[in-house]
C-alpha cells in the first residue's frame, strides 16, 4: 500500500506540473490576441509632417500587428495630420489611412540614405532608338560616388565654381519665330512650328554658349516633350544630349541633369568628350534617378562643377521638390557627385 500511495502521489504531481506547463502557453495566446485587439487611442492634432523614410508603409487599420496595405511611394511628401496615437498618425483625408510615427518628421529629418541617393528607375545606355539596360540591381554607385553635404560646403565650393556656359541670350534673338545661329562654315536656322492638325509643336530657345568646347546650347520644346542639344559654332553640327549639360573643368566630361520626359525625378547622364575639334562625345551611362530631383534651372541654387572635379547639386526628394521648386528661399538638400576613377 505504501508503494501504491507513493505512485499515486507522484502521478498526481506530474499531472499538476503538466497542467502548469501547458497553461501559460494558452494564456500567452489569449494575451497576445488581446494585445492585438487593443485599439490605438487617438487624440486630435493639427500639424504638418513629412514622410522621412523611403520604406514608409500605408495602413488602413491603425494596428502595428496588422499588414500594411501598400508602400507609400511618397518619400519627402508633406501631409496634414489630424490625429495621433502611440504608434500612428492619422492623415487628413477623405478616407481613413495611417502612417507609422517613426516614418514621419520634419524636413530636416528626411533620411537620404545611400540607397535613396543611388537608386534608379533604370540605368543603361541608348544605342540608336533602343535603351540597353544594365544588369539588374545596378545603381549609380557603379559610376558615381554621391554624398550629402551641408549648405556651407555647397556655398564654399560655389565661390570657386566652374560656370562655362555664357548666357548671352541677347546676342542671338529669335525673330518671327526663327533662330539664326552663325557658325564659321554655315548658318543654322531653327524655326518654330505651331501646333496644327498637320504639324506637331516645335519651339526653340537659345540658352547660351559653351565657350571651352565652342558649342551653342539650344532648348527644344515639343508637344508633351522637350530636349537640349548642342550646335557646333564652326560646323553647325548638331549633338544630342539628355538634358542640361555641365562641363567638367578639365573639359573631358559632361554630366547632364534634368527632369525626365515624363516629369518625374531627375535624369542623369555621363558623357566622355572624345574630341573638341571636330566636337565628339560618347555616352557612358544614362539613368533615371528614383527618389530625388535636382534644382536644375534655379538661379540661386545652381548646379556646377567645383575646382575639385566634383559636381555640386541642390536637390530634394521628388515630392518635396514639387512644393519648393518655385520658392527660392525654401530650404533644400545638397549633394556632391564624383565620377569614379575607372570612368575618368
Residue ranges of predicted features:
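Beta-loop motif signature
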Residues: 26-88, 123, 182-195
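Surface-exposed loop/turn elements that mediate protein-protein interactions on large endomembrane-trafficking
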Residues: 177-196, 223-240, 269-288, 326-344
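Solvent-exposed N-terminal domain segments of exported/luminal and surface proteins
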Residues: 106-199
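Blade-terminus and WD-like Trp-Asp/Gly-His loop motifs, strongest in beta-propeller folds
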Residues: 207-212, 245-256, 302-311
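Boundary regions of SH3-family modules and the immediately adjacent low-complexity/disordered segments
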Residues: 24-42, 92-134
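Repeated scaffold domains used in trafficking and secretory/extracellular systems
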Residues: 198-206, 241-250, 291-302
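Beta-strand C-termini and the immediately following turn/loop, strongest in propeller blades
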Residues: 218-223, 256-262, 267, 313-319
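C-terminal motif of bacterial Sec signal peptides marking the signal peptidase cleavage site
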Residues: 14-15
